[in-house]
Amino acid sequence: MDQLKRSLLEAPIIEKNGYHYFVHPISDGVPKLDPGLLREIVIRIIRKAKLEDVDRIVTPAAMGIHISTAVSLMTDIPLTVIRKREYGLDDEVAISQQTGYSENEMYINDVREGEKVLVLDDVLSTGGTLAAVLDALDEIGAEVIDTVAVIKKVGGENKAADAGHDVKTLINVDVVDGEVVIVDEDGDS
C-alpha cells in the first residue's frame, strides 16, 4: 500500500461547524510529514501534471506551499504563493476564498498576463479555493496549463467543476461514519 493511501486511512476525523474533515500532514501539517510521503506525492504530481512550457507554479497559502516548493525544486519551475496578507503591490489581485468551513481574502502578486501556470493545492473539497484562484488567474490573463490537488474529498459540491475548471487529483476519498474511505486510489485525470 502506498504511503498516501495508508496515511489517509489512518487520519483522524474532526468536525468543524458541521463539516467533517480529516487531519493529515499534507492538508494540516499534523501529524508530522514524513519525507517519504512528500517525495511520493511530488513524484506522482510530476508524472500526472502537464509541465511542458509552464512558466511558474502557483499555490494558495498555506498548505500548498510545502508541496509546491518540493515540485519547484524538482522541476526548476519558479513558485508564486497566493497569500492571505495584502501587500498593496501594483499588480496585486484580491480574491475571495470560500471553503466548507471558512471565508477569507487572498492576494495574488507577480503573475502576469500570458504566463503559463501550473496550479497546485493540497485538498479539493468544496472547490471554493481553487475556483476563486482559477477565476482570478483567468481575469489576470494567465494561461492555466494544468491544475492538480493532492487529495479530493468527494460527496459534496465542487465549485471548481461547477465553474468549468478541470482539476486532476492523486487520490479521491470520502469520510463515512467517522473514517476515511478511499473512493479512487488513482484520483482524477
Swiss-Prot record:
One of its GO terms (molecular function) is transferase activity. The keyword Transferase applies. SUPFAM superfamilies: PRTase-like (SSF53271). Its EC number is 2.4.2.-. It holds the Pfam family Pribosyltran. Disulfide bonds: none annotated. GO terms for biological process: purine ribonucleoside salvage. Transmembrane segments: none annotated. Keywords: Purine salvage, Transferase. InterPro entries: HGPRTase-like, PRibTrfase_dom, PRTase-like, Pur/Pyrimidine_PRTase. It comes from the Archaea. NCBIfam families: HPT_Archaea (NF040646), PRK02304.1-4 (NF002635). Belongs to the purine/pyrimidine phosphoribosyltransferase family. Archaeal HPRT subfamily. May catalyze a purine salvage reaction, the substrate is unknown. This is HGPRTase-like protein 1. It comes from Haloterrigena turkmenica (strain ATCC 51198 / DSM 5511 / JCM 9101 / NCIMB 13204 / VKM B-1734 / 4k) (Halococcus turkmenicus).
